[in-house]
């Protein structure tokens, strides 16, 4: 009996030793929490690597349509690249997360949702952490066109965005921040809405007509130019610039060449004279054009304006002060914009005009039904199909003393200035044409006077001010948590 017991004990010990040597049945099974943590660690290994501390990176991709023609607007097709257009990316990291700021030499970000999705998938960066800001350049591929040539361009464009994002992230370098401001001189930009001696309000490019003389501008032009410079040791500094003026004047209305308008010379000059990397972010330019024949100082055109702005940027950098970095704070807020109501009769008239193919007949019907332009006809039809409200996504990103507030529309200059004045941050960039394209967003004052931008706006009076207030609310909350 004892012999049998000893044999059983020996066999049990042998089995235990075998189990230990093979690693079987000796480890405590993972708890669900431990399993989840392990999966999380595995996933984090696939995410974009983030360096410690505050750092910035820069990259740029040429997105010009080389070798093929491309539609620029309803009447023009470009077949030559006079000056390259670019997708520029500035990456900002606080050591824990990354934000990407894109400056795009295109008219608008109509396909902002696609841009966000594509680059987020390529980099792992959340969509909320990105600004895609158009410079509002009118001399590039038409982002709203559905033609095959523009589709061809978009395919290359999306690849360029992903590459620029990855390269900017790879370029992340420890950085210090400096902020500066300077005013552009008289004549560099002006409010394109004004009152004539007969009391009527006018705008766009009607300055030199035979109509009654201009007696007053609707508001003063916002001339402030803002810079954020990232000093990066042995690597080139990055200078981000925020100013406001339509990039819509290169060559002529029947332009057939690609260029970035005044931003071409602006970029070239800053990078040559300051030996930095440059990124331009369009401000509240909905009612602001550059240059004006009514000012004492006259500029020859878009190329000279770009060169003049180089000196303004240099002055802003000369005026700069050190700024803190701090943690990235990122908020996306979506406002419900109340859509303007259209009468059934007005919609019927617009559709009748839209069905007409002959320009002469269109003009006759527009005159008959008191439509100011074909743009108003399109806006009436679109508003009728939009429902009661439409979402307006507002993105705000801040770090230390610096804040960025975006708008997916053409914000008016007075609203942009109001936003910056109300922001608690020492430096605020207000970026229009960002992450979407909702057309013009006139100020409440402009609604009172009427005109082209009001005729084509999709939303009710006061929506622009609502967006300003919401952005200020977010930035105030961010500032309190710095």
Describe each PLM feature range.
Residues 45-134, 141-278, 283-285, 289-304, ...:
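Conserved beta-alpha junction segments in alpha/beta enzyme cores
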Residues 8-16:
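Bacterial N-terminal signal peptides
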Residues 1-8:
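Positively charged n-region of N-terminal signal peptides that target proteins for export
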Residues 32-43:
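Ser/Thr-rich, Pro/Gly/Ala-heavy low-complexity intrinsically disordered linkers and tails
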Residues 15-34:
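Sec-dependent signal peptide cleavage junction
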């Amino acid at each position: 009996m004892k012999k049998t017991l000893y044999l059983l004990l020996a066999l049990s010990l042998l089995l235990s030793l075998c189990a230990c040597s093979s690693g079987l049945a000796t480890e405590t099974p993972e708890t669900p929490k431990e399993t989840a943590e392990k999966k999380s660690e595995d996933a984090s290994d696939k995410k974009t690597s983030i360096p410690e501390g505050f750092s910035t990176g820069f990259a740029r991709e040429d997105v010009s349509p080389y070798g093929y023609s491309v539609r620029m607007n309803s009447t023009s097709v470009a077949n030559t690249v006079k000056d390259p257009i670019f997708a520029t990316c500035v990456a900002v990291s606080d050591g824990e997360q990354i934000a990407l700021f894109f400056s795009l030499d295109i008219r608008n970000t109509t396909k902002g949702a696609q841009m966000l999705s594509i680059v987020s998938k390529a980099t792992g960066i959340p969509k909320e952490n990105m600004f895609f800001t158009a410079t509002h350049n009118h001399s590039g591929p038409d982002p709203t066109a559905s033609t095959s040539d523009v589709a061809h361009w978009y395919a290359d464009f999306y690849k360029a965005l992903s590459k620029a994002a990855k390269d900017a992230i790879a370029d992340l370098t420890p950085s210090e921040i400096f902020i500066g401001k300077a005013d552009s001189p008289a004549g560099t930009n002006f409010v394109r809405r004004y009152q004539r001696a007969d009391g009527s309000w006018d705008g766009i490019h009607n300055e030199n007509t035979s109509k009654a003389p201009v007696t007053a501008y609707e508001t003063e032009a916002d001339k402030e130019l803002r810079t954020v410079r990232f000093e990066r040791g042995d690597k080139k500094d990055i200078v981000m610039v925020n100013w406001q003026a339509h990039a819509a004047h290169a060559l002529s209305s029947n332009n057939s060449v690609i260029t970035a308008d005044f931003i071409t010379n602006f970029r070239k000059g800053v990078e040559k004279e300051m030996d930095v990397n440059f990124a331009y972010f369009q401000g509240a330019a909905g009612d602001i054009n550059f240059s004006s024949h009514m000012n004492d100082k006259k500029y020859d055109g878009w190329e000279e304006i770009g060169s003049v702005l180089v000196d303004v940027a240099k002055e802003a950098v000369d005026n700069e002060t050190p700024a803190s970095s701090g943690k990235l704070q990122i908020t996306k807020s979506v406002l419900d914009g109340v859509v303007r109501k259209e009468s059934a009769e007005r919609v019927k008239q617009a559709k009748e005009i839209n069905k007409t193919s002959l320009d002469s007949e269109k003009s006759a019907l527009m005159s008959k039904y008191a439509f100011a332009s074909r743009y108003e006809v399109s806006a009436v039809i679109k508003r009728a199909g939009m429902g009661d409200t439409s979402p307006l996504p507002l993105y705000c990103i801040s770090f230390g003393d610096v804040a960025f507030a975006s708008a997916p529309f053409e914000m008016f200059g007075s609203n942009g200035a109001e936003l910056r004045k109300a922001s608690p941050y020492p430096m605020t960039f207000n970026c229009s044409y960002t992450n979407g394209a909702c057309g013009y967003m006139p100020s409440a004052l402009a609604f009172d006077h009427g005109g082209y931008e009001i005729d084509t706006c999709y939303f009710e009076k006061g929506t622009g001010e609502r967006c300003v207030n919401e952005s200020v609310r977010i930035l105030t909350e961010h500032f309190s948590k710095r």
